C-alpha cells in the first residue's frame, strides 16, 4: 500500500469499503476503474482496457467512461447483475491541498437504479421479513417515492404471487434465511440479496428518523425498517420524501396468482414478453407516465369492493358521455411531464433547470384542467377536483427565476432569468459588455488626464494596464502606479482599473457560482413543497387512467358492466379485448356466457383444437377482471357477480430449471388451485391431464372436475375445456354441470371453425382435420385415417377404459347378479341388449361386468 501513488492509495482505501461493487472513481471528466474492476467492466461494457502507473513498479489495469454518459454504462452493469459504487470528488480541485478529497456518494443496485431515459415503468425494491407464521413484505420505488406493505400467511406460493405483482428488481432478506434465499433464487427473476437485519427497536428509530407516514403495523416494522436502513446506507440520502405509504391486505383485492397473470397475458404477452398484445397494451391509452404506471397496478390488483368499483365506473361513464370535455382533458394531460419522479430527483439533488421547466409546463395546465373537472358530478372525479392543487406559487417562482433556454448543466451559467437577482444582472452585464466597459474607462481617463492617445491594453503578466507615450509623461496623474517601462512608453495601473479587471476576469466564474447558489435555493424552496407535488401527481394519474378507460370504451364499443354482490356472471356477446384488436372487430365471433352457483356452476367445453376454446375461456376471465378494475368491457351486456380469486391452468411447459416435467408442473398448478379456490372464485381449466397417458389423464380430469363442482369441497364457477369427451357424462351425474362445445361445420374432409359456443358435447376431436389445416402431407393424413378406422373397429383400449369406469363409477343404473346365471342366460341377456339405445360408456360398463362375472362363475364351475 505504501508503494502506491497517493491517488492510488486513496482508491484502494475507498475500494475496501465496497468490495462487492464495481467502483466508479471520479477523475476529472471520467469515472475510472482499476485492477479487477477494470478487467470485468471492460469486458462487460466492451470498452478498451488500458493501464496506469500505480507506483509499485507495475501498471494497474484501467478503463473509464465519461461522467456525462455514465448512466448508460451503469445500466448495462446493473442489468448483468453487478452493483456500482459512485465515488465523487467532494471538493474543488483548484482549492485542494494535495489529493482531492473523494467519497462514495451512492451505491447503485438493481432496485435503486433510476434513469428516465431507459424506462418510465416502476422499479421496485422489496424487503421480506418473517415472523412466526407470516411474511411481511415492503416495496419501495425510490424514483417515485411510493411505498407499499402487506402481510401474508407463510405460504411460499402466495409469496411468489405477491412478489410477481411488483416484479421488483431486487429482494432483500435476512442473512439467516438460507432456505428462503434458495427458494427465491429459484422461483424469482429478481436480484436476491441477504443482508444483516437490525432489531425491532432500531427499526423503529430508523422509521421515525426517515419517513413521516403515520402509525405502521408492528408486524411490518422489521420489513420497513431494514429496507430503509439499506436504502439510506446505499443511497446516502434521507428518504423523508416518501409520503405515500399504503398498507393493504391481499384479500381486499381480486387475487390473481402469478400463473394466471402469465396465462391471461395481463401485463405482457407470452411470446413477445412485452406489453404489446397484452391486456395492459390494449387498455393503456394514458397520456402520462404516471397514469401508465397506475394502470398496471389496477390491472394487477382489481377491486372487490363494489362501492369503489362503481365509483370508477360512474367516472368513466361521465367522461364517456362528455366527449368534447374528454378530448380537451386528454390534450391537457398530454402536456404533463412525469412530475411524480421529481420527488426522488429533489432528494438526490439531481434536479436541473430543465426539470424545473418541465414542472412549470406541467403546472401551467392545472388551472384549466381543474376548471374542466368542476363540471363533473361523479364522486371520484369530484375527489380528484378537490384534491388537485394548481401549485400556482411554484409556477410563479419557476417562471420568474429560470431561463426558458437554460442548459442542463448547472455549471455553465445561463440558468437564472434576467431581473430575478440584481447581482446576477450586474455580473452578466460585465461579462457581456467587458469591451464596452474598458472603452468607457479609456475614454474617461483620456478626458480626465488630457492624454488623447492614452490606451488600455492587456498582457498575462500584469493584466489590464494604461499605456502612456513619452510625450505625455507630464500629464500622468499621481494615482497612476507604474508597472512597466518600455522604450517609448510607460505602462500604469490604477485602483479603479484593477477593480474593473477583477470584475471582468472574475465575472464569468462569479456568475456561474452565484447562479448555482440561487438555483439551489430555488430547488430547496420547491423541495419543501414536494408533498403537494406528489398529491397532484397522484390525482393526475387517477384522472389519466379513468380517461383511458373512457377512450377505449368509446373506440372499441365497450359497455358498462353491472357489478354486484351476487354469484351470477352473465355476458352477452362477450369478446376477447386483445384478440379482437389483433384480427379486427368484424372478424371476431362474440359468445355468451352464463355462470352461477345453482344451474351453471361448471361448463365443460369440448371441441377441436384451434376452434377457440382457450380464447373463449380467457375472454371470460378478462371481462371479469376489467369489470372489477372499474373498466367498461367488450360485450353487449355484462352482469358480473364479484369474484374473490381467479385461477387458470392453461398450456403445458417443462420447468427445466427445477427438473419438473410438463405433467408435474401441470399437477402443481392444479394442486394450488384446489387448495386455494373458494365458492366465490372463477377457475379456468384447459385440458387438465393431457401431460400424461390417456387413462391417467382422463381419471385425473374427471376427479378434479368432480371436486371443484362439489359445493361441499369448492363449488367454484369453472370453465373446463377438455378433449376427454367421456367427461360430458358428468352433466347427467352432477347438478350444475353443463356441456358446451365449439361449433364446427363439416364440408367433406374439411371443417370450418364457427368459433361459436353452443350447448351440448362434442364426440369428435377432429384431430386429422386440424392436421390437414396445419399442412401435414395428404399421404400422411390418409394413412392416419386408415389407422384411426382400425383402432375404432378394434377398440384396442377397451379393457383399460372398462377398468377406469369401474373405479370412478358412482352409480350403475342396474345391478345384475350374474353368479346365478347359466351360460345360456348370459347369452340371452347379451342378445336382448338394445345396442342402439345405450351409450358407448354404458356398453363398456356392461361388458366389463359380464367378463368379471363370467370369470367368477368359471372359478365356481357355474359355467
UniProtKB/Swiss-Prot annotation:
Per UniProt, ATP binds at 607-614
Q: Name one GO cellular component term.
A: cytosol
Which GO terms are recorded in the biological process aspect for this UniProt protein?
mismatch repair
User: Which superkingdom heads the taxonomic lineage of this protein's source?
Assistant: Bacteria
Keyword annotations of the record: ATP-binding, DNA damage, DNA repair, DNA-binding, Nucleotide-binding
Output the InterPro entries linked to this UniProt entry: DNA_mismatch_repair_MutS, DNA_mismatch_repair_MutS-lik_N, DNA_mismatch_repair_MutS/MSH, DNA_mismatch_repair_MutS_C, DNA_mismatch_repair_MutS_clamp, DNA_mismatch_repair_MutS_core, DNA_mismatch_repair_MutS_N, DNA_mismatch_repair_MutS_sf
GO MF annotation: an example = ATP-dependent DNA damage sensor activity
Coiled coil (UniProt feature):
none
Q: Which HAMAP family match?
A: MutS
NCBIfam families with a match to the protein in the record: mutS1 (TIGR01070), PRK05399.1 (NF003810)
> What family does the Swiss-Prot or TrEMBL record give for this protein?
Belongs to the DNA mismatch repair MutS family.
Q: What is the protein's known function?
A: This protein is involved in the repair of mismatches in DNA. It is possible that it carries out the mismatch recognition step. This protein has a weak ATPase activity.
Under which name does UniProt file this protein?
A: DNA mismatch repair protein MutS
Amino acid at each position: 500500500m505504501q508503494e502506491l501513488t497517493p491517488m492510488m492509495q486513496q482508491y484502494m482505501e475507498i475500494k475496501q469499503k465496497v468490495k462487492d461493487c464495481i467502483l466508479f472513481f471520479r477523475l476529472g471528466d471520467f469515472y475510472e476503474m482499476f485492477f479487477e474492476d477494470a478487467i470485468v467492466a471492460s469486458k462487460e461494457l466492451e470498452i478498451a482496457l488500458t493501464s496506469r502507473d500505480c507506483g509499485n513498479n507495475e501498471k494497474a489495469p484501467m478503463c473509464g467512461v465519461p461522467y456525462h454518459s455514465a448512466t448508460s454504462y451503469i445500466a448495462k452493469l446493473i442489468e448483468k447483475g453487478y452493483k456500482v459504487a459512485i465515488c465523487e470528488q467532494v471538493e474543488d480541485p483548484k482549492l485542494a491541498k494535495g489529493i482531492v478529497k473523494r467519497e462514495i456518494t451512492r451505491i447503485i443496485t438493481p432496485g435503486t437504479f433510476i434513469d428516465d431515459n431507459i424506462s418510465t415503468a416502476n422499479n421496485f425494491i422489496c424487503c421480506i421479513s418473517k415472523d412466526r407464521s407470516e411474511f411481511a413484505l415492503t416495496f419501495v420505488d425510490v424514483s417515485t417515492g411510493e411505498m407499499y406493505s402487506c402481510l401474508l400467511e407463510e405460504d411460499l406460493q402466495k409469496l411468489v404471487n405477491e412478489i410477481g405483482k411488483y416484479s421488483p428488481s431486487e429482494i432483500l432478506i435476512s442473512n439467516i434465511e438460507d432456505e428462503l434465499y434458495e427458494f427465491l433464487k429459484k422461483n424469482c427473476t429478481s436480484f436476491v440479496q441477504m443482508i444483516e437485519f437490525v432489531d425491532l427497536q432500531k427499526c423503529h428509530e430508523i422509521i421515525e428518523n426517515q419517513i413521516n407516514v403515520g402509525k405502521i403495523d408492528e408486524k411490518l416494522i422489521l420489513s420497513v425498517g431494514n429496507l430503509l436502513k439499506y436504502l439510506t446506507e446505499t443511497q446516502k440520502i434521507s428518504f423523508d420524501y416518501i409520503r405515500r405509504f399504503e398498507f393493504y391486505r391481499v384479500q381486499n383485492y381480486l387475487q390473481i396468482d402469478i400463473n394466471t397473470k402469465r396465462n391471461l397475458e395481463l401485463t405482457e404477452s407470452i411470446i413477445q414478453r412485452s406489453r404489446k398484445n397484452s391486456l395492459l397494451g390494449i387498455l393503456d391509452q394514458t397520456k402520462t407516465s404516471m397514469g401508465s404506471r397506475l394502470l398496471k397496478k389496477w390491472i394487477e390488483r382489481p377491486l372487490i369492493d363494489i362501492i369503489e368499483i362503481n365509483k370508477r365506473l360512474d367516472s368513466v361513464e361521465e367522461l364517456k358521455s362528455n366527449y368534447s370535455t374528454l378530448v380537451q382533458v386528454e390534450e391537457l394531460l398530454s402536456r404533463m411531464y412525469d412530475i411524480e419522479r421529481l420527488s426522488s430527483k429533489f432528494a438526490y439533488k439531481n434536479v436541473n433547470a430543465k426539470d424545473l421547466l418541465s414542472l412549470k409546463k406541467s403546472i401551467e395546465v392545472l388551472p384549466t384542467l381543474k376548471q374542466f373537472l368542476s363540471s363533473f358530478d361523479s364522486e371520484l372525479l369530484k375527489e380528484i377536483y378537490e384534491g388537485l392543487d394548481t401549485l400556482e406559487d411554484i409556477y410563479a417562482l419557476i417562471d420568474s427565476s429560470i431561463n426558458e433556454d437554460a442548459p442542463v448543466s448547472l455549471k455553465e451559467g445561463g440558468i437564472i432569468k434576467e431581473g430575478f437577482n440584481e447581482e446576477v444582472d450586474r455580473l452578466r452585464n460585465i461579462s457581456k459588455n467587458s469591451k464596452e466597459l474598458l472603452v468607457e474607462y479609456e475614454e474617461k481617463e483620456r478626458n480626465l488626464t488630457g492624454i488623447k492617445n492614452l490606451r488600455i491594453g492587456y498582457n498575462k503578466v500584469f493584466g489590464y494596464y494604461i499605456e502612456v507615450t513619452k510625450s505625455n509623461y507630464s500629464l500622468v496623474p499621481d494615482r497612476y502606479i507604474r508597472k512597466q517601462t518600455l522604450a517609448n512608453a510607460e505602462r500604469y495601473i490604477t485602483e479603479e482599473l484593477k477593480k474593473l479587471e477583477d470584475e471582468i476576469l472574475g465575472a464569468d466564474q462569479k456568475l456561474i457560482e452565484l447562479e448555482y447558489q440561487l438555483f439551489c435555493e430555488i430547488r430547496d424552496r420547491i423541495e419543501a413543497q414536494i408533498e403537494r407535488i406528489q398529491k397532484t401527481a397522484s390525482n393526475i394519474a387517477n384522472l389519466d387512467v379513468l380517461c383511458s378507460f373512457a377512450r377505449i370504451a368509446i373506440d372499441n364499443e365497450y359497455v358498462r358492466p353491472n357489478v354486484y354482490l351476487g354469484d351470477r356472471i352473465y355476458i352477452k356477446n362477450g369478446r376477447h379485448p386483445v384478440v379482437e384488436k389483433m384480427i379486427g372487430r368484424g372478424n371476431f365471433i362474440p359468445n355468451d356466457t352464463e355462470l352461477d352457483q345453482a344451474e351453471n356452476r361448471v361448463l365443460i367445453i369440448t371441441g377441436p383444437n384451434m376452434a377457440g376454446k382457450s380464447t373463449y375461456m380467457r375472454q371470460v376471465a378478462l371481462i371479469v377482471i376489467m369489470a372489477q378494475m372499474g373498466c367498461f368491457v367488450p360485450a353487449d351486456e355484462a352482469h358480473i357477480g364479484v369474484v374473490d380469486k381467479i385461477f387458470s391452468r392453461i398450456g403445458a411447459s417443462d420447468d427445466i430449471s427445477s427438473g419438473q416435467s410438463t405433467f408435474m408442473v401441470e399437477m402443481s398448478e392444479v394442486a394450488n388451485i384446489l387448495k386455494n379456490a373458494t365458492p366465490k372464485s372463477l377457475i379456468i381449466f384447459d385440458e387438465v391431464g393431457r401431460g400424461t397417458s390417456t387413462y391417467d389423464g382422463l381419471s385425473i380430469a374427471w376427479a378434479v372436475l368432480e371436486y371443484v363442482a362439489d359445493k361441499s369441497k369448492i363449488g367454484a364457477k369453472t370453465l373446463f375445456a377438455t378433449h376427454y369427451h367421456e367427461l360430458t357424462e358428468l352433466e347427467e351425474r352432477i347438478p350444475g354441470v353443463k356441456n358446451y362445445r365449439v361449433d364446427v361445420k363439416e364440408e367433406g374432409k374439411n371443417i370450418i371453425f364457427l368459433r361459436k359456443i353452443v350447448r351440448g358435447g362434442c364426440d369428435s376431436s377432429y384431430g386429422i382435420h386440424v392436421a390437414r389445416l396445419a399442412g401435414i402431407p395428404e399421404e400422411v393424413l390418409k394413412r392416419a385415417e386408415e389407422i384411426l378406422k382400425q383402432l375404432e373397429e378394434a377398440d384396442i383400449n377397451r379393457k383399460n377404459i372398462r377398468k377406469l369406469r369401474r373405479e370412478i363409477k358412482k352409480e350403475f343404473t342396474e345391478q345384475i347378479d350374474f353368479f346365478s346365471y347359466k351360460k345360456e342366460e348370459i347369452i340371452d341377456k347379451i342378445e336382448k341388449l338394445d345396442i342402439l339405445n345405450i351409450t358407448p360408456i354404458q356398453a363398456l360398463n356392461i361388458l366389463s361386468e359380464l367378463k368379471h362375472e363370467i370369470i367368477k362363475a368359471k372359478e365356481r364351475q357355474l359355467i
